[in-house]
From Swiss-Prot:
It comes from the Bacteria. One of its GO terms (cellular component) is plasma membrane. Catalyzes the transport of trimethylamine (TMA) from the environment into the cell. Binds TMA with high affinity, but does not bind trimethylamine N-oxide (TMAO), glycine betaine, carnitine, choline or dimethylsulfoniopropionate (DMSP). Together with the TMA monooxygenase Mptmm, is part of a two-step metabolic pathway that improves both growth and survival at high hydrostatic pressure (HHP). Induction: Expression is induced by HHP stress. Keywords: Cell inner membrane, Cell membrane, Membrane, Transmembrane, Transmembrane helix, Transport. The chain crosses the membrane at residues 15-35, 54-74, 94-114, 146-166, 186-206, 233-253, 265-285, 317-337, 349-369, 402-422, 456-476, 477-497. It is found in: Cell inner membrane. This is Trimethylamine transporter. The gene is tmaT.
Amino acid sequence: MFKKLLDNKNLVINPPVFITSILLIVALILTCVLFPEKVGVWFPAAQLAVTSNFGWFFVVTVNVILIFAIYLAFSKFGRIRLGGDDAEPEFTKASWFAMLFSTGMGIGIMFFSIAEPVSHFFNTPRPVDTDIEAAVQAMQFTSLHWGLHAWGIYAMVGLALAFFGFNRKLPMTFRSLFYPFWGERIHGWWGHIIDILSALATVFGLSTSLGLGVIQITAGLEYLYGWEISPMMQAGIILFVIGIATISVFSGLDKGVKILSNANMYIAASFMLLIFILGPTLFIMKGYVENTGAYLANFIDISTWNDTYLGSGWQNVWTIFYWAWWIAWSPFVGSFIARISKGRTVKEFVLGVLIVPGLITLLWMNVFGGSALHTILSGDVTMIAAVKADVSTALFVFLENFPFTKFLSIVAIILIFSFFITSSDSGSLVVDNITSGSNGESPVWQRVFWSFAQGIIAIVLLWGGGLDALQTAVIITGLPFAVILLVMCYSLQKGLKEELAKSSKKAKSKEEKSYKEIIAELLDEPQSK
């Protein structure tokens, strides 16, 4: 059977990566289906083991990656251009930023923009004496989770893939990041293992986001219309969205994802603007400035906090989950960012990925989270009760504080759908590239296959344990990948150093040639060819 599969001319795959990834995914799905009760015990135990014993390692990893990203931007490597000295950007900066934001955050900001700040308010990371202190701390840690560290991870993974893909002409997969160490051996089994891990991390990271999206969509439909949530309803919504994403897949990167990302930005900007205008506008403006300042002022403290002395377990549930999620999400986001960033310099790339989407994300969290906290501080504790009861309905309970509640709720659901489709479309492209090593040259149906595979995994994990199962899958796949990212940083610096030396040698050669031409002209001698 496998021989026929490999001989199929309509397939463009890297067999060891493609087949092994599918077998491991199928094994997980069968385990969840056949042993649901045991999975309900295994998943929490696995999550606790990883977060309790390796939480510190996640903290170190994300900080090292962010520091390294900032160093590269302002170092001598910052002037290196992705794709070579003559490469030009394929997308305008507006479209580039739109695709960065839609792919990098998407569904997550819809799910957590209300639930997280409110949750941190009534369950603070550190002990506080007043509600005001609780609100300040809630926004600080929300900013930590959605700010520079997340985008620093994406920036470094995207930069490494873009550099080795465009400048070294290697496959745009994670095995290529180890070329400075292994050379041509990246095409052997060690390279296959790296790509298999990145494929699994991408699939489970995507499935988590898709799962969060369908949980919130069904919660919104139940809250608005009283529809009863059932596993079949969740599965139907996932398959419906995957079907729409398939249409986008056939349109290609330049049309499908670009158009969807731009549409996402327009809808998201309009939605945020409405909340900003209809909500406590002055409070939001003042809060954005103050919260961003507090985040930066306490940056070292909160970003290196390990819950060592309190031992409350709070960090394991929140911060470590986020660091693992961003790391597991990074092969997908990084690969996609790399594909759309040809022609950018290293400095432009890093600062563009870090600053613009980061500021927009923090603005979003302040508009929504700040408004929710303002409601609570004004004496209305409905939001606290809503988050405690069901975090997935928090956004829709929040919108009841505004006029045009029904309209705003429908816009929110449309936006979640839109982010859902974008993630599925661009995610299928990335997983297909990893498992085929084709840099986008594989047949469309392979991307469609991975699109449906992500949906099925999300369905199985939801049925097997809901949000807890999704979080556990992310944390477990994020741990080995954190090690890969640290090695990636060293490998990238080595590659950039070689690139800079090569460019300097080429420039010196051109300079020497020009001197010879000038002398030849002065002596009126024919130039040697």
